Amino acid sequence: WPVGRIPDEKGKEAVFLLEQLRYLNNEYAVKVEAKSMRATSFLSSLLAGLAAFIQNRLRAVQKDVNLGCSAEVWKLPSSEVYAAIDKASALKLSPPTTPETLLDKQASKAKFAYFNLHGLKDAPEWYGQRDFRTQSRDPEYPIALTPSLFDNQNKAPELILSEACYGANILDKKADDAICMTFLATGTRAFVGSTCIAYGSVAKPLIAADLLAHDFWTHVQQGVSVGYALMRAKMTLARNMTANQGYLDGEDQKTILSFVLYGD
């Protein structure tokens, strides 16, 4: 079943958890009020229907702003994944992308964000990786993303999927020590990531976390809710790998088990 978790930071204080619950409560209250207004009168229903029609038309005309960043060495699979939500050519690579340049030309808060970067169990940053096939003099493992990049002025994307190892690891961490919790504290409504090592490929075809991410975004673009999109992506991964190789290997099993949803 689709399950979304509401994480909390370490310590005895519950401020981080309460802020998330308060935000969700407000969101639900707005939805309930909207439904109640639609049911009060014919005129209200008519106006609500007209507002929904206008909103849908505006969405059709206005293109959502999205964000994507991958380690340079994983450009090929990451580009195919990102193409599910935006132009593959818009995917940023690290190197050369750094925290100082990641949001360059980002006119507004991103709706969707996809990251395929390195993560460490005990480090708050995510890292890129130079493509070993190039002659570049860029750092081999540059910092690509830090928790301080997003705040109340620079809101985090609405929905994020990250393939970073330990991207969803929150054990014994404060909010500033885990990017996923920083995201949730600064505007992200749902975050999907791995609690441990994530597995992918440097080339095609897509496997493990790459395949999961591609199918997840495909379902989201079709209007499927985030929880069901993740559940269906896991089911598709299990079905395809079983059909292709007759079983689920260790990487497949860990991918299905380790990717979780935070938020709602």
What are these regions (language model features)?
Residues 9-13, 98-102, 199-200:
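A short acidic, often aromatic-flanked loop/helix-cap motif at beta-alpha or helix-coil junctions
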Residues 46, 67-173, 177:
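Catalytic-core segments of thiol-dependent peptidases
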